[in-house]
Amino acid sequence: ATMQVSNGEGSQWRIDMSVRGRKGFASILGLNLEQSTVFRVDGDTYVPLSQSTVRKAMFFGKKVTGVYNWQTASAQWDGDLKKERQQAIPLQRGDQSALSLNLSLMRDAQPGRSLSYRYVDVGRVRKYDYKVADATEVVQVGDLSYDALRVYRVNSGDNETILWIANGVPTPVRILQRDKGEDQVDLRLVEYQGA
């Protein structure tokens, strides 16, 4: 997987994430996921402007794009998704896309804090609540070792999301997603390059 943040025109930024299935069933299916969010920074808030998701596999492909229109205070997606998820969604200040949410967690994670965000992405609205561990822990990722804060979603039911965030590292050093106790996605930072 790769994650990249780049400066666009003026005050606009873009965050891209690309995941390639290289092990197990994901490798057999040739599963690939590409996500992108264009956003601007308004004070201490990441403001998403547009979002796209492309999923590819051996037997299917899906593409979804969305626009966050802050002048009309609504967001809307089109592409390969259900009709009810193509309806306009009223926006609220501070709403986050999946990728801008990761940036917000990186910025906001402090020992012992509780964090809350409204996730608006791919035609869905959800409240995401997180708890940050009281202290850092050593996280081994390949040959690298990080002193990182564990940040975990507390209102996700059987679907767990845990991130490990290290001071001075521009992305989470690890993102683990579990469904009913089974690891589904385990992304680990094995290398990063500065600007």
Region roles according to the model:
Residues R85-P90, M106-A109, Y119:
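Short, mixed-charge, low-aromatic patches
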Residues A57-N102:
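Hydrophobic, well-structured mid-protein blocks that either form specific transmembrane helices
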